[in-house]
Amino acid sequence: MSLSATQKQEVITSYQVHETDTGSADLQVALLTTRISQLTGHLQQNPKDHASRRGLLKMIGRRRRLLSYINSKDSQRYQDLIKRLGIRR
């Protein structure tokens, strides 16, 4: 369950910090959030897909660590990102 190239590019252009940004923590969190939402839909239709569930939990953990890093560096940027992505934490 990966993102298509057009979906990924849309997320990159809307969340990049500067013009050539392709891997900032904010952008990584946005990409992970998009993948997590897709995988959540897949798991609702396929509840016995345990391999995908494990991948989902790993992505959630990675996103949580990135969000903790952003919060430790700049809490206002963290709050803005959480609000913009619509995730609760």
Curated annotation (Swiss-Prot):
One GO molecular-function entry: structural constituent of ribosome
Record Gene3D superfamilies: 6.10.250.3130, S15/NS1, RNA-binding
TM ranges: none
Extract one GO BP annotation from the record. Answer: translation
Q: Does the keyword Cell membrane apply?
A: no
Provide the assembly information: Part of the 30S ribosomal subunit. Forms a bridge to the 50S subunit in the 70S ribosome, contacting the 23S rRNA.
What the record says about family reads: Belongs to the universal ribosomal protein uS15 family.
Q: What does this protein do?
A: One of the primary rRNA binding proteins, it binds directly to 16S rRNA where it helps nucleate assembly of the platform of the 30S subunit by binding and bridging several RNA helices of the 16S rRNA.
Protein name, per record: Small ribosomal subunit protein uS15
Organism per entry: Rippkaea orientalis (strain PCC 8801 / RF-1) (Cyanothece sp. (strain PCC 8801))
Identify the taxonomic lineage of the organism of origin.
Bacteria, Bacillati, Cyanobacteriota, Cyanophyceae, Oscillatoriophycideae
Which gene does this sequence derive from? Answer: rpsO
